[in-house]
A protein has these predicted regions:
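Carbohydrate-active catalytic/glycan-binding domains of CAZyme proteins
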Residues: 1-273
């Protein structure tokens, strides 16, 4: 499945979600992504289809408009924030334009595998006149730093897909103006399409690292990286350093193509990220 996300909770279980398609097509011949499934297992290996030692549940489903427009439910992520479970995902918001997609959220305040999930609707901004989420927007992720929540996401303010950051007042509302962190500038970020998307955060060695996806979603899809000192202001774009080369690309020898939109999780013994 595309856009895999794995979260290790304090209960010792791994929770997995990803973009899911049942391989059915709409009338335009496009794959339909209309469900959000979550899996839970005691190990990362147990999450795989081949092992199958997991429990799985559909927590959200949306039928195509008029039967022919895919709702484009993409890139779900499952997070546990301040005592509640959240699933962040992207979906279509228009009855006429399948490409009008925006960030959304679900919430569960009980057992994510058995209790009800509530649709909280689109992610909001409290900043009057902000451009946030007014254009093609997707791949939002959330991280906590020094007691504050921050959201990263990709948005097409121009023809390119860029990555932005903002501070949050709660898990579904940003409360500062969006700050541009990176836009596609190198050749390896512009194969097929000029794209920076799919940000993912990991903290290590006194730094915060953001790994992100670049180029179109074909064999040349790859990963770039930026980092910042953990004591710097994450909303200060000038404090971030962007590598001029990709950190993960296709390997013809190993027949691995299009590595993109990753996530990070903890090892079973909690020694490694």
């Amino acid at each position: 499945r595309a856009d895999p996300f794995i979260f290790k909770h304090t209960d010792g279980y791994y929770y997995f979600t990803a973009s899911h398609t049942d391989a059915e097509h709409n009338l335009d011949g496009k794959y339909q992504y209309r469900k959000i499934l979550i899996r839970r297992a005691a190990s990362i290996n147990d999450l795989s289809d081949s092992v199958g030692n997991y429990s799985e549940r559909c927590v959200y489903e949306r039928e195509p408009i008029c039967g022919n427009r895919s709702p484009h439910i993409w890139a779900p992520e499952i997070h546990f924030i301040r005592g509640k479970w959240y699933i962040y995902f992207t979906t279509t918001v228009s009855d006429t334009d399948v490409w009008q997609i925006r960030p959304h959220a679900l919430c569960c305040d009980g057992d994510p595998m058995t209790d009800e999930w509530t649709n909280l609707g689109p992610i909001k901004t409290s900043v009057e006149g902000s451009r946030a989420f007014t254009d093609f927007s997707l791949d939002h992720t959330v991280f906590e730093h020094h007691g504050e929540l921050y959201m990263l996401w990709a948005q097409k303010v121009t023809q390119d897909s860029d990555i932005y950051i903002a501070r949050m007042s709660d898990p579904t509302t940003i409360c500062t103006e969006m700050v541009l962190l990176t836009r596609p500038e190198y050749d390896w970020e512009r194969f097929g399409f000029a794209v920076n998307e799919g940000p993912s955060i990991i903290k290590h060695g006194g730094k915060i690292f953001m790994v992100f996806s670049c180029s179109g979603t074909d064999a040349r899809y790859c990963l770039g990286m930026m980092y910042i000192d953990e004591n710097a202001d994450v909303l200060d774009a000038s404090a971030w350093t962007k590598l001029s080369h990709p950190v993960f690309t296709m390997c013809r020898e190993n027949k691995q193509f299009g590595p993109g939109h990753n996530s990070f999780t903890r090892s079973e013994d909690d020694r490694f990220d």
